UniProtKB/Swiss-Prot annotation:
Domain PUA: 286-364
Designated gene of the protein: proB
Protein name: Glutamate 5-kinase
Taxonomic lineage: Bacteria, Pseudomonadati, Pseudomonadota, Betaproteobacteria, Burkholderiales
Leading EC class: transferase
Positions annotated to bind substrate: 60, 147, 159
GO cellular component: cytosol
Family recorded in the similarity comment: Belongs to the glutamate 5-kinase family.
One Pfam entry name: PUA
Pathway involvement of the protein, from the record: Amino-acid biosynthesis; L-proline biosynthesis; L-glutamate 5-semialdehyde from L-glutamate: step 1/2
Catalytic activity of the protein: L-glutamate + ATP = L-glutamyl 5-phosphate + ADP
Keywords for this protein: Amino-acid biosynthesis, ATP-binding, Cytoplasm, Kinase, Nucleotide-binding, Proline biosynthesis, Transferase
EC number: 2.7.2.11
Subcellular location, record wording: Cytoplasm
Length: 378
């Protein structure tokens, strides 16, 4: 792990921020919303607005509020009951934030997203345009996953990931992940009192992922590993990440003033174009193509397109234009991108030179399976 030192938080220079607030920071230990806590976050974000900063808030808490409104003491396991609780609770969550921000003369907007919204290029661009319009109008967007319609197979899984995707979507300067932990430790501090705190590191450092466990409260679903991976995602759009305790007094305003709180993960990874960022942010891939060593080298080190001659195997079913993963012979993903041929056609032309595509398929739409402009090395 490569550590860095910094006297001033990276948040102080950020003009556009995404702040993610976990369930435990807006609920009464999972039993409905904590209105005082909601007001506390609204006050801090209002202060950031006064400084000219644009803020998007990614907030959990809908299911916990729904359970309280429905009188449920135990979190249900059935998907349809969780979705019902989310639908009921989202009303309360929006009402609470609307009332809290109104105290400071600010309007709020509800944005509910699913993975399908961000996987579809047109819907992705529409969501992006809407968020930009809201920010220009001085509105505070409140973002959450659309739990009512999402399925297990296409869930973001946690709001840490959603926060990173929104960060990339709006090209934010920084992502702040607020949790019930101080930040990142080299081991779980609840099990190892001698665990050392990590104040500064580089987003995407493999050593961070290796040492991260599933630290987190019983209310939320996001452990430290999801936060580290979220920081890695955000870094590819140039955004720095801070993982800090939401229990710290006025944590957002103090970060904005330059105080170093929590773990700061600086963005040092190559910044991808908006299109390549969209490709990289796909959480659900339609299939995989297994590449030989020569093809892997061509993608990773020569910036080449993927040709059918370098494909050893096709896994899964997909159509032309789907996002497909490229993996090496050991199953490790090395790239992903838009495929030019269906899985059925790819199986027919794998291991063949591009000059044979028309003969085998009857016509050739593209000489490449994936053009280098439509793939991203991961």
């Amino acid at each position: 792990m490569t550590a860095q030192t910094s006297a001033v938080s990276v948040i102080s220079a950020a003009n556009r921020l995404v702040a993610k607030v976990g369930s435990s920071l807006v609920t009464n230990e999972g039993r409905g919303l904590d209105r005082a806590a909601v007001g506390h976050w609204a006050a801090q974000i209002a202060a950031l607005h006064q400084q000219g900063k644009q803020v998007v808030l990614v907030s959990s808490g809908a299911i916990a509020e729904g359970m309280a409104r429905l009188g449920w003491r135990k979190r249900p396991s059935a998907m349809h009951e969780l979705q019902a609780a989310a639908a009921v609770g989202q009303m309360g969550l929006c009402q609470a934030y609307e009332a809290a921000f109104a105290e400071f003369g600010l309007r709020t907007a509800q944005i509910l997203l699913t993975h399908e919204d961000l996987a579809d290029r047109h819907r992705y661009l529409n969501a992006r345009s809407t968020l930009f319009a809201l920010l220009r109008l001085g509105v505070v967007p409140i973002v959450n996953e659309n739990d009512t319609v999402v399925t297990d197979e296409i869930r973001f899984g946690d709001n840490d990931t959603l926060g990173a995707l929104v960060t990339n979507l709006i090209e934010a300067d920084a992502l702040i992940i607020l949790t019930d932990q101080r930040g990142l430790y080299e081991a779980d501090p609840r099990r190892d009192p001698a665990a050392r705190f990590v104040a500064h590191a580089q987003a995407g450092d493999a050593a961070l992922e290796a040492m991260a466990g599933g630290a987190g409260s019983g209310v939320g679903t996001g452990g430290m590993l999801t936060k580290i991976l979220a920081a890695k995602r955000a870094a590819h759009s140039g955004a720095h990440t801070v993982i800090a305790s939401g229990r710290e007094r006025n944590v957002l305003t103090r970060l904005a003033q330059g105080e170093c709180i929590g773990t700061e993960l600086r963005a040092v990874l190559p910044v991808w174009s908006a299109r390549k960022q969209w490709l990289a942010d796909h959480l659900r891939l339609r299939g995989r193509v297994v590449l030989d060593d020569g093809a892997v080298h061509a993608l990773l080190h020569e910036g080449k397109s993927l040709l059918p001659i370098g494909v050893a195997e096709v896994q899964g079913e997909f159509e032309r234009g789907d996002v497909v993963a490229c993996v090496d012979m050991h199953g490790r993903e090395c790239a992903r991108g838009l495929i030019n041929y269906s899985s059925a056609d790819t199986r027919r032309i794998l291991r063949q030179p591009s000059s044979q595509i028309a003969r085998i398929l009857g016509s050739m739409t593209d000489p490449e399976l994936m053009h280098r402009d439509n793939l991203v090395v991961t």
